[in-house]
């Protein structure tokens, strides 16, 4: 089936199923283009709650579909590629987290949304890269166990007076962006501003002109007087940047900054998920209710 036919069929089935398509900025360009809403993790969570559709097709990795299912238990959430998992989410386990909580009984667990529903259920509050600092600063506790990303934990620690106890996880895609990569690109494009995602290594963030979530990076590039930008995150964001400010130039900091899991979802899989209503995301009730409390606490935090 040609791409134009795929798109038309997807549109027909969206109407038939009363479905909405949500996609992360790291998705394939053609998937972003057929989505009703494209955003970062915080924006996608907020949009899922706002939706009145019966079916949510979530073009992303498994934890994203789980979050939508937790927040919208009355909706059918479909994940076009059920094997699209997040390596970082798999770096934290329940038993290990429980041991850490026992070691630090006065600490509050802040869970980055890039984690499983079970880990969210073991946490007090969730956060995204867009609101992590505000979430941590909203807490009364002075100690925070931050899971699973040590790089985001380090970024938050540099912007709070709280004691951060980091979990030893990381995003492989962001972690392999090196300081040397940035310096080479800066030498090649001396007029370009370097904007970076807080999942990057601390030594990479030290070189950044601006640090933000994916949506924050788009807004910065759009509103900045600069005309060129080196992008320190997954390469899929370039599509959103070009759409937001097509007159500007963008350079991916590394050719290796590509998440294989996020690229697993394609138009064919979106179509099949709508045709067969397959890969429905389910979360056990006892996990869902506790995880929802952590997500709801996050959504209640006001950000700048």
UniProtKB/Swiss-Prot annotation:
Binds 1 [4Fe-4S] cluster per subunit. The keyword Acetylation does not apply. InterPro entries: NadA, NadA_sf, Quinolinate_synth_type2. It comes from the Archaea. One of its GO terms (molecular function) is 4 iron, 4 sulfur cluster binding. It is found in: Cytoplasm. Its cofactor is [4Fe-4S] cluster. This is Quinolinate synthase. It comes from Methanosarcina barkeri (strain Fusaro / DSM 804).
């Amino acid at each position: 089936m040609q791409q134009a036919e795929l798109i038309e069929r997807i549109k027909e089935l969206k109407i038939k199923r009363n479905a909405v398509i949500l996609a992360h900025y790291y998705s394939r360009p053609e998937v972003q283009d057929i989505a009703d809403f494209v955003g970062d993790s915080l924006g996608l969570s907020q949009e899922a709650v706002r939706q009145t559709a019966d079916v949510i097709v979530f073009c992303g990795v498994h934890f994203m579909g789980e979050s939508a299912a937790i927040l919208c238990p009355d909706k059918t959430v479909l994940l076009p590629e059920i094997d699209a998992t997040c390596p970082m989410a798999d770096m934290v386990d329940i038993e290990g987290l429980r041991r850490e909580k026992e070691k630090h009984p006065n600490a509050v667990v802040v869970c980055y949304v890039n984690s499983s529903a079970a880990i969210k259920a073991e946490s007090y509050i969730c956060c995204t890269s867009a609101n992590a600092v505000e979430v941590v600063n909203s807490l009364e506790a002075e100690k925070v166990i931050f899971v699973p990303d040590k790089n985001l934990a380090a970024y938050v620690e540099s912007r709070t007076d709280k004691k951060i106890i980091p979990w030893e996880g990381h995003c492989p895609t962001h972690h392999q962006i090196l300081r040397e990569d940035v310096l080479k690109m800066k030498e090649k494009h001396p007029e370009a501003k370097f904007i970076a995602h807080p999942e990057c290594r601390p030594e990479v963030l030290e070189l950044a002109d601006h640090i933000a979530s994916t949506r924050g990076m788009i807004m910065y590039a759009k509103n900045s007087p600069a005309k060129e930008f080196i992008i320190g995150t997954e390469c899929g964001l370039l599509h959103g940047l070009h759409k937001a400010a097509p007159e500007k130039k963008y350079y991916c900091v590394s050719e290796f900054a590509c998440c294989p899991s996020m690229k697993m979802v394609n138009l064919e899989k979106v179509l099949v998920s709508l045709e067969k209503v397959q890969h429905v995301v389910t979360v056990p009730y006892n996990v869902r209710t506790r995880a929802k409390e952590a997500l709801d606490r996050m959504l209640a935090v006001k950000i700048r």
